[in-house]
Amino acid sequence: MAGQFEGRVLVLGGGSVSQCTVPLLLEHIVKRSDQLTIMDFQDMTPRFEDALKAGAQFVIGKVEQSNLAQILSQYVSRGDVLIDLA
């Protein structure tokens, strides 16, 4: 069952909790998988193979105080969702 949320979703962190959360987001929250971006400072793409094949994006990056506004403005805006699992 596809979700109804039409905005973008940014998930920070590629660990175990994120690995459990991403499939739930794809199944129940977002309408299209290309709405979902996962970000971690390490390459965790093998952990998200199914989500990436479905159209989600993985970005290697790190959100810090010095780049917070710049990074977040690229991936989320008003009405979007940021999930910090880092």
Predicted regions and their residues:
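Phosphate-coordination loops involved in phosphoryl transfer and adenosine-cofactor binding
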Residues: 5-8, 78-79
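Conserved hydrophobic helix-helix packing surfaces used for dimerization/oligomerization
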Residues: 8-9, 36
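Glycine-rich adenosine-cofactor-binding loop
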Residues: 9-23
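Gly/Ala-rich phosphate-binding loop of Rossmann-like dinucleotide-binding domains
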Residues: 22-30
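NAD(P)-binding Rossmann-fold cofactor-contacting core
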Residues: 30-50
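Conserved Rossmann-fold cofactor-binding substructure of NAD(P)-dependent oxidoreductases
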Residues: 62-75
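N-terminal Rossmann-like NAD(P) cofactor-binding module of classical short-chain dehydrogenase/reductase
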Residues: 80-84
